[in-house]
From Swiss-Prot:
<feature type="site" description="Interaction with tRNA">
    <location>
        <position position="349"/>
    </location>
</feature>
<dbReference type="GO" id="GO:0103016">
    <property type="term" value="F:tRNA-uridine 2-sulfurtransferase activity"/>
</dbReference>
<feature type="binding site">
    <location>
        <begin position="12"/>
        <end position="19"/>
    </location>
    <ligand>
        <name>ATP</name>
    </ligand>
</feature>
<dbReference type="Pfam" id="PF20259">
    <property type="entry name" value="tRNA_Me_trans_M"/>
</dbReference>
<dbReference type="GO" id="GO:0002143">
    <property type="term" value="P:tRNA wobble position uridine thiolation"/>
</dbReference>
<feature type="region of interest" description="Interaction with tRNA">
    <location>
        <begin position="152"/>
        <end position="154"/>
    </location>
</feature>
<comment type="function">
    <text>Catalyzes the 2-thiolation of uridine at the wobble position (U34) of tRNA, leading to the formation of s(2)U34.</text>
</comment>
<feature type="binding site">
    <location>
        <position position="128"/>
    </location>
    <ligand>
        <name>ATP</name>
    </ligand>
</feature>
<dbReference type="InterPro" id="IPR046885">
    <property type="entry name" value="MnmA-like_C"/>
</dbReference>
<protein>
    <recommendedName>
        <fullName>tRNA-specific 2-thiouridylase MnmA</fullName>
        <ecNumber>2.8.1.13</ecNumber>
    </recommendedName>
</protein>
<feature type="active site" description="Nucleophile">
    <location>
        <position position="103"/>
    </location>
</feature>
<comment type="similarity">
    <text>Belongs to the MnmA/TRMU family.</text>
</comment>
<keyword id="KW-0547">Nucleotide-binding</keyword>
<keyword id="KW-0820">tRNA-binding</keyword>
<keyword id="KW-1015">Disulfide bond</keyword>
<dbReference type="InterPro" id="IPR004506">
    <property type="entry name" value="MnmA-like"/>
</dbReference>
<dbReference type="InterPro" id="IPR014729">
    <property type="entry name" value="Rossmann-like_a/b/a_fold"/>
</dbReference>
């Protein structure tokens, strides 16, 4: 009999292949496994996007196949209060937030963990995220590690977790590559084996982002200008654009000074004038940053960084690691200097720090340190 047989794990069942295989693997490892399906968004009448019922049906089918009980919980009000309102406020302020990070912080590893703990008497929770964790002995703090599949690693979205949360969490697919996860699901006859991965922001689903956002925030059209002040076109609202963006400006055929035909990129948002500044060419100095200032810091160890640290950083998901130096300003703010200038550093997004495979934590980008040519 496995040592795990006395341990109860509540798996977040999303109706996707990763959580399905997570539940199967934990059962194979001898744990007492139960599922919990979260409803985080009250669907509108638009049946085209209404996937919650389908996801629940898939989660139930998988649990039935594995012989485990599926609990259901509605976290829609917590989601609205703690994730969605922040998301809207950030967009209103001209920043580009990442709601998936906040959803993990406030819902999946807080509200979910508390419910699993207090109501379901769980020893652990488990999620289908592609991350790993250490299992230290001698009372050391567990660390969060990148997932083995570099293409799927999701540690960027989980940097707000504390070592206590990591200690209570299991990530069964973190040691696997995605094709292997699908192969296991197929072998076990799980209905989710070929289900495509969900994309887009959790509560928006596959629908068009601009249409969704315009329901909650009135659009304010304005000019798109060059750095010299030439009007290049019109934007429908600053909130629909992010720094470094190329698509969707509708000024593609327009030549710049001297007949320059290079593509246009968003370089800045001028909130006071409601103007989008666009520049030509990905190597334009206005797109580059020497570093950033970050706040709202979360370190996995929960100890503030007080010394200069050499490490790497990601300023967006699926980005190559950038070698950098962290310089503490105080316990709440840090300055980060890149070894080489970086493009499209975006206020509101998260900067997440690593030493090797270990995720140290991260913070919200408050502002970028603009590139100054020598």
């Amino acid at each position: 009999m496995s040592d795990n047989s006395q341990k109860k794990v509540i798996v977040g069942m999303s109706g996707g292949v990763d959580s399905s295989v997570s539940a199967y693997l934990l059962k194979q490892q001898g744990y007492q496994v139960e599922g919990l399906f979260m409803k985080n968004w009250e669907e509108d009448d638009d049946s085209e996007y209404c996937t919650a019922a389908e996801d629940l049906a898939d989660a139930q089918a998988v649990c039935d196949k594995l012989g485990i009980h599926l609990h259901k919980i509605n976290f829609a009000s917590e989601y609205w209060d703690n994730v969605f309102e922040y998301f809207l406020a950030e967009y209103k302020a001209g920043r580009t937030p990442n709601p998936d990070i906040l959803c993990n912080k406030e819902i999946k590893f807080k509200a979910f963990l508390e419910f699993a703990d207090e109501v379901l008497d769980a020893d652990y929770i488990a999620m289908g995220h592609y991350v790993r964790r250490s299992f230290p002995e001698n009372g050391e703090k567990p660390q969060m590690l990148r997932g083995l599949d570099g293409n799927k690693d999701q540690s960027y979205f989980l940097y707000t977790l504390s070592h206590e949360q990591v200690a209570r969490s299991l990530f069964p697919v973190g040691d696997l590559e995605k094709p292997e996860v699908r192969r296991i699901a197929e072998e076990q006859g799980l209905i989710t084996a070929k289900k495509k991965d969900s994309t887009g922001i959790c509560f928006i689903g596959e629908r068009k982002f601009t249409d969704f956002l315009s329901r909650y925030l009135p659009a304010q059209p304005g000019n798109i200008e060059s750095p010299e002040g030439e009007v290049l076109g019109q934007h429908q609202g600053l909130m629909y654009h992010t720094l470094g963006q190329r698509k969707g400006l509708h000024i593609g055929g327009r030549k710049g000074g001297g007949g320059n035909e290079e593509p246009w990129f968003v370089a800045e948002k001028d909130l006071k004038r409601n103007v989008l500044i666009a520049v030509q060419g990905q190597d334009h100095p206005m797109l580059k940053s020497e570093g950033l200032i970050a706040s709202q810091l979360h370190w996995v160890e929960r100890e503030p960084i007080r010394d200069v640290v050499k490490c790497t950083v990601k300023t967006r998901y699926r980005q190559q690691d950038i070698p950098c130096t962290i310089i503490p300003i105080d316990d709440e703010n840090i300055k980060v200097i890149f070894d080489e200038p970086e493009i499209a550093v975006t206020p509101g997004q998260s900067a997440v720090f690593y030493q090797g495979d270990v995720c140290l934590g991260g913070g919200i980008i408050e502002k970028r340190i603009k590139y100054t040519q020598a």
